[in-house]
């Protein structure tokens, strides 16, 4: 078992900034009797745990099969470390115990160099962010970050707006569960802005959650002049065009794929782009 040697006392690398953001989202620290840090993600994201452990080998890897107790649960992998020094270093960098409860209003953006902030935000996005895909319009995306701390999201919003990544106003999110926690969400629904967010998050990235990056990479803007777009189902460019419709989110073009015979709608990039203006009403698949 490797000893923790104050590696996270100063956040001065891409990997440390990413890990700090991920811990802000998905980690927890406790100070009762033993000083512990644990972050856990599901089996589909095991590779990220392996990547983090390779970069920070002082952590202990754990595996737990929650399916023994709930058939709908999956195997989960986690990183854990009992260390007072690690607890103190994370605390000094803004990680609080009970950060989703009584300390949620204490959570703030850490004081990092600008060149590291994108990696911190990417880490937080990989923990508590998602990309929503419309089932009816599979080329449409909405990116969002959730938190119980509205103040923390306001700080993310202010920072990203200062570099030209504009979002809708922060809103309360319907949880659809018995949880008493109130969630807030900052979201990006404009096509050009989503691509700008992607470029910001992944520039010089060395570590990330692959499935979320893949969703960003799969998003393409359909221009009005593109008469033969890629089919979002079979990925071929062999489509026939149909009607043009003015929808609540912009101009929609209907196509039929000659290969798979499926029909789909794609939004043209127009000046009055208002993609998914009413997200609560849209039929989406979060990832």
Each model region followed by its residue ranges:
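Internal intein/HINT superfamily modules and their associated LAGLIDADG
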Residues: 1-263, 269-287
């Amino acid at each position: 078992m490797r000893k923790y040697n104050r590696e996270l006392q100063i956040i001065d690398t891409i990997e440390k900034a990413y890990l700090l953001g991920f811990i802000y989202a998905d980690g927890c620290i406790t100070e009762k009797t033993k000083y512990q840090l644990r972050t856990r993600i599901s089996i589909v994201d095991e590779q990220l745990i392996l990547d983090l452990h390779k970069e920070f080998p002082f952590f202990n890897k754990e595996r737990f099969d929650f399916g023994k107790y709930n058939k709908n649960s999956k195997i989960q992998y986690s990183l854990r470390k009992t260390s007072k020094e690690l607890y103190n270093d994370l605390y000094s960098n803004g990680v609080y115990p009970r950060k989703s409860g009584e300390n949620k209003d204490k959570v703030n953006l850490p004081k990092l160099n600008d060149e590291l902030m994108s990696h911190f935000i990417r880490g937080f996005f990989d923990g508590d962010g998602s990309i929503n895909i419309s089932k009816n319009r599979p080329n449409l995306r909405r990116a969002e970050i959730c938190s119980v701390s509205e103040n923390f999201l306001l700080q993310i919003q202010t920072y990203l707006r200062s570099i030209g990544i504009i979002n809708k106003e922060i809103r309360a999110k319907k949880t659809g569960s018995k949880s008493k926690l109130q969630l807030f969400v900052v979201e990006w629904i404009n096509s050009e802005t989503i691509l700008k967010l992607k470029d910001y998050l992944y520039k010089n990235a060395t570590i990330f959650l692959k499935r979320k990056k893949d969703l960003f990479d799969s998003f393409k803007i359909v221009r009005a002049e593109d008469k033969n777009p890629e089919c979002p189902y079979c990925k071929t460019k062999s489509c026939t065009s149909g009607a043009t419709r003015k929808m609540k989110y912009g101009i929609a073009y209907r196509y039929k794929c000659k290969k798979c015979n499926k029909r789909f709608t794609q939004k043209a990039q127009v000046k009055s782009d208002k993609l998914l203006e009413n997200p609560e009403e849209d039929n989406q698949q979060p990832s």
